[in-house]
A protein has these predicted regions:
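Charged, low-complexity, helix/coiled-coil-prone segments
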Residues: 1, 5, 34-36
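Enriched for short, Lys/Arg-rich terminal
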Residues: 1-3, 22, 27, 53-83
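Surface-exposed, Lys/Arg-rich phosphate-binding patches that contact polyanionic backbones
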Residues: 12-23
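Residues that form generic nucleotide/phosphate-binding pockets
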Residues: 13, 28-31
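A short, surface-exposed loop/turn module that caps and links secondary-structure elements
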Residues: 30-57
Length: 83
């Protein structure tokens, strides 16, 4: 997985989430990070068109995220928790 990681777009994005939501965000974000590292093998050397904003939903969780291929990171833009 090289140096790939995930991070929220702002420091306080996850602050108000209940523990179950935070655990779900961490799990999904880790899975996305692994998947993206396997999809974009060139990482920092990537020269193609990067993907735009994407959404993933798991149960009561919906994440909007952006893959920064050259930065080898998944940036969580928005979190919705219906629970």
């Amino acid at each position: 997985m090289a140096d790939w990681h995930w991070e929220p777009v702002t420091d306080g994005l996850l602050d108000e989430l209940p523990p179950a939501a935070l655990a779900a965000v961490r799990q999904v974000a880790e899975e996305l990070t692994v998947r993206e590292s396997m999809t974009f093998l060139d990482g920092r050397e990537f020269t193609g068109e990067p993907p735009g904003l994407r959404t993933v939903q798991r149960g009561p969780l919906m994440l909007v995220y952006l893959t920064d291929v050259r930065g080898e990171r998944v940036v969580i833009i928005q979190v919705n928790w219906i629970g």
